[in-house]
Curated annotation (Swiss-Prot):
Coiled coil (residue ranges): none
Organism per entry: Shewanella sp. (strain W3-18-1)
GO molecular function: rRNA binding; structural constituent of ribosome
PANTHER family: MITOCHONDRIAL RIBOSOMAL PROTEIN S5
Cysteines paired by S-S bonds: none
Domain S5 DRBM as annotated: residue spans: 12-75
GO biological process: translation
Recorded name of the encoding gene: rpsE
Name recorded for this polypeptide: Small ribosomal subunit protein uS5
Role summary: With S4 and S12 plays an important role in translational accuracy. Located at the back of the 30S subunit body where it stabilizes the conformation of the head with respect to the body.
UniProt keyword Transferase, yes or no: no
Length: 167
C-alpha cells in the first residue's frame, strides 16, 4: 500500500499556494493554528485542490495535500491551452481565461497560475475580478476549467460530427 501511494505521489506536481495563521479565542487566551491551501496535478489535465488545518504548519500542509489528491477532476486540454474562453465564479471571485497562441506562457496571477501550471496549461491569458482571496480564486479557476467543453464533447451532445461543429 505504501509503495502504491509513493508511486502515485511521484507523478503528481504539488504546489503550496498559501499558509495562514488563524486563532481561536477561548477563555484562557488565544489558540493558534495554521491553514494551508495546496493544488496537485499530473500536468496532463488532472487537478485537485485541498485545504488543511492543523496546530503545526507541516501537518496542515500534509492534510491539504491528501485532500487535494482525493478530490481530483479531469479537464480536457487543447495542446497545452484551452479550447475556448471560459468564465468561472465562486462567491465573490470571478475569473476569465482564454486560449493563447504557442509561446505566450501563463499570463495569470498568484493562485490561478499555480492551478494552471499543475493542470498542464502552458499558454493562457487570464484575469481575476472581484475578491482575490486565494481559496476563492482556486475554486473559481477549477470551476471554469471543469465547465470547459472540448469540440468532441459538444459534438457528442448535439449528435453531430466534430467537422460539422467547427463549420
Amino acid at each position: 500500500m505504501a509503495k502504491l501511494e509513493a508511486q502515485q505521489k511521484d507523478d503528481l506536481q504539488e504546489k503550496l499556494i498559501a499558509v495562514n495563521r488563524v486563532s481561536k479565542v477561548v477563555k484562557g487566551g488565544r489558540i493558534f493554528s495554521f491553514t494551508a491551501l495546496t493544488v496537485v496535478g499530473d500536468g496532463n489535465g488532472k487537478i485537485g485542490y485541498g485545504y488543511g488545518k492543523a496546530r503545526e504548519v507541516p501537518a496542515a500542509i500534509q492534510k491539504a495535500m491528501e485532500k487535494a489528491r482525493r478530490n481530483m477532476v479531469t479537464v480536457e486540454l487543447n495542446a497545452g491551452t484551452l479550447h475556448h474562453p471560459v468564465k468561472g465564479r465562486h462567491t465573490g471571485s470571478r475569473v476569465y481565461m482564454q486560449p493563447a497562441s504557442q509561446g505566450t506562457g501563463i499570463i495569470a496571477g498568484g493562485a490561478m497560475r499555480a492551478v494552471l501550471e499543475v493542470a498542464g496549461v502552458h499558454n493562457v491569458l487570464s484575469k481575476a475580478y472581484g475578491s482575490t482571496n486565494p481559496i476563492n480564486i482556486v475554486r473559481a479557476t477549477v470551476d471554469a476549467l471543469v465547465h470547459m467543453k472540448s469540440p468532441s464533447q459538444i459534438a457528442a451532445k448535439r449528435g453531430l460530427n466534430v467537422d460539422e461543429i467547427r463549420g
